[in-house]
Curated annotation (Swiss-Prot):
Domain EF-hand: 14-42, 44-79, 84-119, 120-151
GO MF: calcium ion binding
Gene3D superfamilies from the UniProt entry: EF-hand
Binding sites annotated in the UniProt record for Ca(2+) 2: 57, 59, 61, 68
Coiled-coil annotated spans: none
InterPro entries: EF-hand-dom_pair, EF_Hand_1_Ca_BS, EF_hand_dom, EF_hand_pair_protein_CML-like
Protein name: Probable calcium-binding protein CML31
Residues binding Ca(2+) 3: 133, 135, 137, 144
Keywords on record: Calcium, Metal-binding, Repeat
Organism: Oryza sativa subsp. japonica (Rice)
Role description: Potential calcium sensor.
Binding site for Ca(2+) 1: 20, 22, 24, 26, 31
């Protein structure tokens, strides 16, 4: 869920001021919900807005001060980046997983490596898979592939 994006402290302050509709120096769940709809086009329920506020509300007053708001924005940016990275990994996994089995087999790995100009034999491919095959089934699941790509 996108909350907003602010690269600098000045942008964060300006964004906070935009979301602080009543100008009291705090953002309520209702203000957050309204601004997410009007400025970002993102519909959130009262409950979701309340959960977003609660997720960073350090003092427990049910409102966001500027520092708490900045933490919310930063968390949203990290989440968005993780989603983008996950989508890219899913696409890469799909390139290697060519047999429709939902996993990368030694054969599918070999085929893709050949397309990329690397001539590995099937035993080399088995060894590559074995290194990250956490459950020992001889193939790489998407989760194992993610671990391999982040290693």
């Amino acid at each position: 869920m996108v909350v907003a994006s602010a690269a600098s402290p000045c942008e964060s302050s300006a964004l906070f001021a935009t979301f602080d509709h009543d100008g009291d120096g705090r953002i309520s769940a209702a203000e957050l919900r309204l601004c997410m709809k009007t400025t970002l086009g993102e519909e959130v329920s009262d409950e979701e807005a309340g959960q977003l506020v609660a997720s960073v509300d350090a003092d427990g007053d049910g409102l966001l001060c500027e520092a708490e708001f900045v933490r919310l924005v930063q968390a949203a940016e990290v989440e968005e980046e993780d989603e983008r990275r996950g989508t890219g990994l899913r696409e890469a996994f799909g390139m290697y997983e060519m047999e429709g089995e939902g996993c990368i087999t030694p054969t599918s790995l070999r085929r893709m490596l050949r397309r990329l100009g690397s001539d590995q034999d099937i035993d080399d491919c088995r060894a590559m898979i074995c290194r990250f095959d956490l459950n020992g089934d001889g193939v790489l699941s998407f989760d194992e592939f993610k671990i391999m790509m982040n290693a």
